[in-house]
């Protein structure tokens, strides 16, 4: 899962949106560094990552990547799940339009930025102003995201080429998303994540 899915599941679970979004920027044990609700959100994010990586649908989707891009498939898929969530937001969350949810999330997260890791603060400078969460609907933006990650981390250069795998298997990936994401939503609503 990437930013949008983590925020969505956190919202459904009444968990900390800042903690869930910040988790990838916090290493090790966060105890003592953040308020309890942020820590709970960090741990929820980590549980979701482990659960998602071990889902049969996600493991199968990884196998659809070519050998030269399979190593980065987990990262590429995380971004792609956000694409499908953004694409189908109105169906999955009919009572809360995506633009309203994004405004709500921003209002929850921006106030905690002064006490946040610098890399997380940097992310937030772009996430909201460039409307990333809404733009995940656009496959051109997904390609830009993958290229940006590859540019910042040379060992992830294969992310550039993983775009081709997404294009080749788009319909199958969308099917996989529908097989697992509604279940994740139910788990979140039942506080089981």
UniProtKB/Swiss-Prot annotation:
The keyword Hydrolase applies. The keyword ATP-binding does not apply. It comes from the Bacteria. Pfam families: ACP_PD (PF04336). GO terms for biological process: fatty acid biosynthetic process. InterPro entries: ACP_PD, ACP_phosphodiesterase_gpbac. Its EC number is 3.1.4.14. Keywords: Fatty acid biosynthesis, Fatty acid metabolism, Hydrolase, Lipid biosynthesis, Lipid metabolism. It catalyses: holo-[ACP] + H2O = apo-[ACP] + (R)-4'-phosphopantetheine + H(+). GO terms for molecular function: [acyl-carrier-protein] phosphodiesterase activity. Disulfide bonds: none annotated. PANTHER family: ACYL CARRIER PROTEIN PHOSPHODIESTERASE. NCBIfam families: PRK10045.1. Belongs to the AcpH family. Converts holo-ACP to apo-ACP by hydrolytic cleavage of the phosphopantetheine prosthetic group from ACP. This is Acyl carrier protein phosphodiesterase. It comes from Klebsiella pneumoniae (strain 342). The gene is acpH.
């Amino acid at each position: 899962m990437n930013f949008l899915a983590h925020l969505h599941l956190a919202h459904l679970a009444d968990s900390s949106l800042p903690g869930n979004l910040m988790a990838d920027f916090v290493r090790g044990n966060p105890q003592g560094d953040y308020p309890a609700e942020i820590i709970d959100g960090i741990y929820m994010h980590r549980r979701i990552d482990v659960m998602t990586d071990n889902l049969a649908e996600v493991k199968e989707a990884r196998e659809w990547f070519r050998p030269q891009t399979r190593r980065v498939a987990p990262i590429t898929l995380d971004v792609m799940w956000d694409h499908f969530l953004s694409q189908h937001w109105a169906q999955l969350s009919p009572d809360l339009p995506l633009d309203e949810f994004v405004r709500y999330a921003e209002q929850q997260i921006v106030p905690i930025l002064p006490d946040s890791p610098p890399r997380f603060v940097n992310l937030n400078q772009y996430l909201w102003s460039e409307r990333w969460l809404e733009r995940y609907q656009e496959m051109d933006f997904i390609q830009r995201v993958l290229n940006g990650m590859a540019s910042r981390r040379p060992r992830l250069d294969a992310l550039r080429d993983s775009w081709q795998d997404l294009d080749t298997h788009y319909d199958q990936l969308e099917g996989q998303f529908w097989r697992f994401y509604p279940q994740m939503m139910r788990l979140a609503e039942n506080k089981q994540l």
